[in-house]
């Protein structure tokens, strides 16, 4: 399903095109999991990934494969999710600046809210009122009526929202009580700000933390609040007294995640130190170390299907999600066998999780090879892979080889200008094309491994070819060579479709490839799958979103001009020849040194008078190819070219000479001399 941010084209910032190289079905979390929501009625767990994907899992332990489905629409980290309407609706918040409304049972996106101007980091939910709040780095808090959101349609797509102002810094945490009478935000301002969401009135500001407030919880009636901070403390606040009434120093490092039981008497905490504790709020010395994760804890979700809770789900910066049993803790608590010495190290009650939702690997390192087409990557499992940027696919799994050695092994003395950028934020390869350099790279078809139908070796623009492949299914990009009258006839004969030219004629990208149009600042305007661009709705939205620089290439077929490189050609000092007038020459940066040698041979050295005399008319005579080959062979036998006294390989092109040998600013200077016989 496509998403679009409608906006006046004149007011739009520069638009980039991105795409993700990935499998059609990404079954496993590729990166850390930022948020969890449990639906005990359906035995389903929702995970919100840093790979931009929300996944649904069965928590039925008898099921061998827990994966149910993926919910894909976001283009950046999903930072928070909330289940509403008794599990029928899911709300998500993302670093792509959007809040999305999903049908949780069927797994599709119903609507997208684009009110935020920066990363959306936190959501809060008032269950009794079906009210949701969203907040993020733009310092804004917006209130949403869930029943209104779920009623949105293509024609009825206007929604009003209330906003809470007053935050001075980026918001990282949010909490609202079930009855929707109090809402609290935590931020890098290190204070808690409190509002009444019914009137949007500011109620108070609570000071005490010395670092970012990462997690917040409110009791049912909105009289008490728990906060976890990067300063390593958990604080209990009385809103009636407008002050902190208890501070819990349980963790060695920042506290990033909190859960509390229904009675608001026991708090579960986790964070940077990877440990998960349960602390009795009435007696802080009664703390239990439940378990220790293998990575910093990002989120926890209590299984509230029983009271007291029998298990807790935990996600971390790694891709695995673990379910830890709390039964041993309840038995331990009943025994009263606490270690009241808070300075003494505690032994975890659980050493193995009760259930594990396995995760996948995340790409953590990459190297763009010199051909500016292939990329080497290393993932969290230390496995190395070889990727084809142009065809948007993995070329080869190389296994656990030495990454640096593999880079050295694949080095070629060839220079191609940069024409794309790579991002690994989601754990997958995201390639971005920008108008400023997308068309910088030209290559010969044969060098790129492509053959032309007519046997020629045309010059190909990599960025142009890729854009044509990404939008191959968009009808507006198709070429129909027939005249209108013939079109009508062919349509009747059923031949029209076969005559339409699609794509670039050389290669295709996988049809499931996500294509993203976004502002340079990161805001997504439109996301769709490559294969869906032929749909009526998607095609219409593409008309409104695709920038002119992409239209020029894909629709109008106006390929950019070749890159020119200026250079000087002079006799080498060892040749004894008189230095020529310093004329500034210019040629395509892909011109091979061999062609410059031919120029020197024919025009300057003048070894073959006949060749020189006929060179101007050679193109019009039979045997042109044979004569060109003769000249090339003679030139290589008689002439050598040098740059900074290094003899040049005839197969090199000018841009490679400039990049690897000349290496400095100013115009390239090439010297020539006759080979000694």
Swiss-Prot record:
GO cellular component terms, A-Z:
late endosome; lysosome; nucleus
Please provide the Gene Ontology terms (biological process) for this protein: DNA damage response; double-strand break repair via homologous recombination; positive regulation of double-strand break repair via homologous recombination
For region Disordered, the annotated ranges are: 611-632
- Please name the SMART domains in this protein's record: WD40 (SM00320)
Give UniProt keywords alphabetically: Cytoplasm, DNA damage, DNA repair, DNA-binding, Endosome, Lysosome, Nucleus, Repeat, Ubl conjugation pathway, WD repeat
Q: Where are the WD repeats?
A: 28-67, 73-112, 115-154, 166-205, 208-247, 250-289, 292-334, 358-397
Gene Ontology MF terms in the entry: deubiquitinase activator activity; DNA binding; double-stranded DNA binding; single-stranded DNA binding; ubiquitin binding
Q: Which Pfam families match?
A: DUF3337, WD40
Q: Which SUPFAM superfamilies match?
A: WD40 repeat-like (SSF50978)
Localization in the cell: Nucleus; Cytoplasm; Lysosome; Late endosome
Query: Which PROSITE patterns does the record match to this protein?
Result: WD_REPEATS_1 (PS00678), WD_REPEATS_2 (PS50082), WD_REPEATS_REGION (PS50294)
What is the recorded function of this protein according to its Swiss-Prot or TrEMBL entry? Regulator of deubiquitinating complexes, which acts as a strong activator of usp1, usp12 and usp46. Enhances the usp1-mediated deubiquitination of fancd2; usp1 being almost inactive by itself. Activates deubiquitination by increasing the catalytic turnover without increasing the affinity of deubiquitinating enzymes for the substrate. Also activates deubiquitinating activity of complexes containing usp12. Together with rad51ap1, promotes DNA repair by stimulating rad51-mediated homologous recombination. Binds single-stranded DNA (ssDNA) and double-stranded DNA (dsDNA).
Record text about domains: The WD repeats are required for the interaction with deubiquitinating enzymes USP1, USP12 and USP46.
Recorded hits in PANTHER family, A to Z, give: WD REPEAT-CONTAINING PROTEIN 48
Q: Which family does it belong to?
A: Belongs to the WD repeat WDR48 family.
What is this protein's record name? WD repeat-containing protein 48
């Amino acid at each position: 399903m496509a998403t679009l941010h409608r906006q006046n084209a004149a007011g739009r910032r520069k638009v980039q095109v991105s795409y993700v190289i990935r499998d059609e079905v990404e079954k496993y979390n590729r990166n850390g999991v930022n948020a969890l929501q449990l639906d005990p009625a359906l035995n389903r767990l929702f995970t919100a990934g840093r790979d931009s994907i929300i996944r649904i899992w069965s928590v039925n332990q008898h099921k061998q494969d827990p994966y149910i489905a993926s919910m894909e629409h976001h283009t950046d980290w999903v930072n928070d999710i909330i289940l509403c309407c008794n599990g029928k609706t899911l709300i998500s918040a993302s670093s792509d600046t959007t809040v999305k409304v999903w049908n949780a049972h069927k797994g599709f996106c119903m609507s997208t809210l684009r009110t935020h101007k920066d990363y959306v980091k936190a959501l809060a939910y008032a269950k009794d009122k079906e009210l949701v709040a969203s907040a993020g780095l733009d310092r804004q808090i917006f209130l949403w009526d869930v029943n209104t959101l779920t009623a949105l349609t293509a024609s009825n797509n206007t929604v009003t929202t209330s906003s809470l102002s007053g935050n001075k810094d980026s918001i990282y945490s949010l909490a609202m009580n079930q009855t929707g009478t109090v809402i609290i935000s935590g931020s890098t301002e290190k204070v808690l700000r409190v509002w009444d969401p019914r009137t949007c009135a500011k109620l108070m500001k609570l000071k005490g933390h010395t670092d970012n407030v990462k997690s917040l919880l409110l009791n049912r009636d909105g009289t008490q609040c728990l906060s976890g901070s990067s300063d390593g403390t958990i604080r209990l606040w009385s809103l009636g007294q407008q002050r902190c009434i208890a501070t819990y120093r349980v963790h060695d490092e920042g506290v990033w995640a909190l859960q509390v039981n229904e009675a608001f008497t026991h708090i579960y905490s986790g964070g940077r130190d990877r440990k998960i504790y349960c602390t009795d709020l009435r007696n802080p010395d009664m703390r239990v170390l439940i378990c220790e994760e293998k990575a910093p804890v990002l989120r926890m979700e209590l299984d509230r299907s029983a009271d007291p809770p029998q298990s807790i789900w935990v996600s971390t910066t790694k891709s695995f999600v673990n379910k830890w049993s709390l039964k041993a803790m309840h038995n331990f608590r009943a025994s009263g066998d606490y270690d009241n010495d808070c300075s003494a190290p505690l032994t975890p009650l659980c050493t193995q999780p009760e259930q594990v939702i396995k995760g996948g690997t995340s790409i953590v390192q990459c190297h763009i090879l010199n051909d500016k087409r292939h990329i080497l990557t290393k993932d969290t499992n230390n496995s190395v892979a070889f990727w084809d940027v142009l065809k948007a696919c993995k070329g080869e799994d190389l296994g656990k080889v030495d990454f640096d050695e593999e880079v050295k092994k694949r080095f070629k003395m060839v220079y191609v200008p940069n024409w794309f950028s790579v991002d690994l934020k989601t754990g997958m390869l995201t390639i971005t094309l920008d108008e400023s350099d997308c068309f910088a790279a030209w290559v010969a078809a044969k060098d790129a491994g492509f053959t032309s139908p007519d046997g020629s070796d045309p010059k190909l623009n990599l960025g142009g070819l890729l854009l044509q492949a990404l939008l191959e299914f968009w009808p507006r990009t198709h070429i129909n060579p027939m005249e209108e009258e013939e079109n009508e006839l062919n349509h009747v004969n059923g031949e029209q479709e076969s005559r339409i030219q699609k794509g670039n004629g050389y290669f295709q990208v996988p049809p499931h490839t996500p294509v993203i149009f976004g502002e340079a600042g990161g805001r997504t305007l439109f996301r769709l799958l490559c294969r869906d661009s032929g749909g009526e709705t998607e095609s219409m939205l593409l008309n409104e979103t695709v920038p002119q620089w992409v239209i020029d290439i894909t629709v109008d077929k106006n390929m950019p001009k070749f890159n020119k490189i200026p250079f000087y050609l002079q006799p080498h000092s060892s040749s004894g020849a008189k230095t020529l007038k310093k004329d500034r020459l210019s040629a395509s940066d892909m011109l091979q040194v061999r062609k410059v040698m031919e120029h020197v041979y024919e025009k300057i050295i003048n070894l073959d008078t006949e060749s020189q005399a006929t060179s101007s008319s050679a193109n019009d005579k039979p045997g042109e190819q044979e004569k060109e080959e003769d000249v090339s062979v003679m030139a290589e036998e008689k002439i050598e070219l040098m740059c900074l006294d290094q003899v040049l390989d005839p197969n090199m092109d000018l841009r490679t000479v400039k990049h690897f040998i000349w290496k400095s600013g100013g115009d390239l200077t090439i010297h020539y001399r006759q080979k000694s016989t």
